[in-house]
Swiss-Prot record:
It comes from the Eukaryota. Transmembrane segments: none annotated. This is Deadenylation-dependent mRNA-decapping factor pdc2. It comes from Schizosaccharomyces pombe (strain 972 / ATCC 24843). It is found in: Cytoplasm; Nucleus; Cytoplasm, P-body. One of its GO terms (cellular component) is cytoplasm. Interacts with dcp2. Interacts with lsm1; via C-terminus. Keywords: Cytoplasm, mRNA processing, Nucleus, Repressor, RNA-binding, Translation regulation.
Amino acid sequence: MSFFGFNTTLPKENMFPNEGQLEEDGIDFEETYDDLGNQLNEAGDELNDETFGVSAGSIGRDFDFSGTTAQASAQLEDEQYQINQQNIFAKPVKPASSELPQVSRLNGASQFPSREPASTAINKLSDLQPMASIWENIVPEKPAIIPPEVASLQDRLGAQPSEKVFSLQELEEQLLNSMTAPKPPSQPAIPIVPSEMAAQVTRENISSLDPAISAASIGNVTFGQPNIPSTTTDFAGLAAPNMVHPSQAIPNPVMQPSLVPQMPYPQNGMYNPSVAPPASLVNLFQQEQLIQNQNLDEKRQKLERDHMLMAQCAGLMTRSDKSFIARIQISQLMSEDPESDDFYYRVYSIIRGRKPSEEEASHFIQTYLGPSNNRRRGRRSENPMQKLQQQLQRLVSSAKERPKATQLSLEGALGKIAVNTVRTPRQLLNVKRPTEPASSNSSLNNFSGFSTKKDVLHAIEKVYDLLLDFEQALRKASTLETTDQEQIDTWKTTLSEKLESIWKALYINESLEASSKTRPPFISIISHPKGMRLLPRLFPHLSKEQQISILKVVVYNFDSLDIVLRGTFDVNGELPLDVVSEMSSFTQFIIPPLLTIVNELDLETINNLFSQLLNRTNAVYLIQTKIGLSFLTLFISRAEILKQSGTVNQNEKEEWENTFNVMFNRVKGHFSTVFPPPNARAYADESYPWEFLAACATAASSEQHFTLVSETRDRVLDNIITSKRAPSEIAVVRISNVNLFLNAMGLDARQLSA
């Protein structure tokens, strides 16, 4: 039944295979509109029965919607098939360039005659919706759901043209230019096929996609837009069959343009070959799909890695364990006496036998053995209070039954470490302590030397501590009362004891008894710059015998000093920097106290020390070092002073002359090596070689004077000649050094220069 005079038996897409060419004329709504709608009387509804021909009460309840719908659907399909068979090749295909797409005015009127396909017009007539002014309660039609991939492509393609609004003349000119413009040579020719085949191919390709994409594509191609030519709509509708679904993406990350299928475009009024989407747009869409898939894969892999890392630590602590630790921490923060709330302290108290009060016991149970909030469904959970009480009972009983370790069982053991478990979280270390002082004294007496530099530094620090303690006790003398003799005696006894401790810490006796193969401990101490500074502070408080003992240790082990072993110049005339620093410290802190001792010795002692120095060292090597020359000069000068004083007997003089002759004969022919090499400019003007030669010239005979002059002649003349060209300060130093040697033999530098 038709209320508005339309033929409802005609199929909706009857004219679609026939390219929309209707045999009858188009319908012009402007001519047929007779303004009858304004004459309707909508005041009352009492004539509804006469208008619709039936009454509301006569409507039955026996509806058969499925049967009627099935019959109508089958009839429509048969009619559609017959019409398609009759009109497949009824009319030739007209070129699309002869048709102009209809452009709507802004007010809804048409500029050109309508060339819309008949199927579209019939669809519009069949799908007319009642106006909202007549039917007020019409539910608005929901827009078609467009997949996000198609929507993103439409937005990119349509974003730029939509920014500018064209006028009617500009749109017409643009459409005419696009249809008449020549096709670029690089564009492949698009095959022209009948519209029936194109439509069939389009439906098949669209139906192979997802329902959402196919529905959106069909709506965009056929029914979605009016006659306004929209490039975005055409591209979206035509590119939809060639789109690759994300679930069907090929695994090859490089997209090949040649693999994209070429789809023929129908040559009807809505499609134009000149505006067909190029292959670059399809490739752009496929690249976007590939990037999205890669991003999804990266996110998925990152999520899997995070889950794997978290799974490694999963299950280490239960919720009950976490709450148990939280209760312990909170109880320690809130308690005024954290020690009494400590778990280990409570266990220790229980083992010791101290019984806690009821209040402390209740607080302990509430803190550590409280009920857990972790409820296990379907399983019986153990009571932690009972479990821990049993563990405590076993711990106490085992501690009482365990026999106490005796001293015999700990013999020869460095320590005993308990197994670190939950029940014994702390390690127990039982170290044997020395109880016999005799063993320590015997080990001290058998001490032969330090093994590492750390031991040497530790010994130096120990001596400093004892020395500071001794000096502190020495300063207490000002507070003593001179009348209290007992207090003075106690103070002297304390000083002597402290001084004896310092003497033992220096290992002087062990150094005297040390063999030549090992380095004495005292030599190791004074070889360090910090140990050298000890001697000037300690020497005034030592006795003369102790001072001579220190001198003997230095002389007997002179070749063990680093400044002697490494004190010779290399081929470049240089010395190591650390050796230079140690030589400076030795000259500043060691030689002055020893010089004080030497100046108080007799000739016999000097003779013995000088003989020991020559016997224990290599004299030729010794004269090439600064410290060696200084010690030789020290002993020779003291012996000559004693010999010329007239206080020594003839035997001592002869003994000294024999000892000096032994030294002179050993270094004979090597006196020129006492000077630094010519390339050692920093040491060229030092006076220690000339002091040694002057001491030797004083003790030498006439024949020995000739040997000294002949071996040192070149260096003497060189100093005299270069002093004439050198600055006045340097010239004075060089002339004075030469005169120091020549004056000992009764000569002068002015005689040689003349």
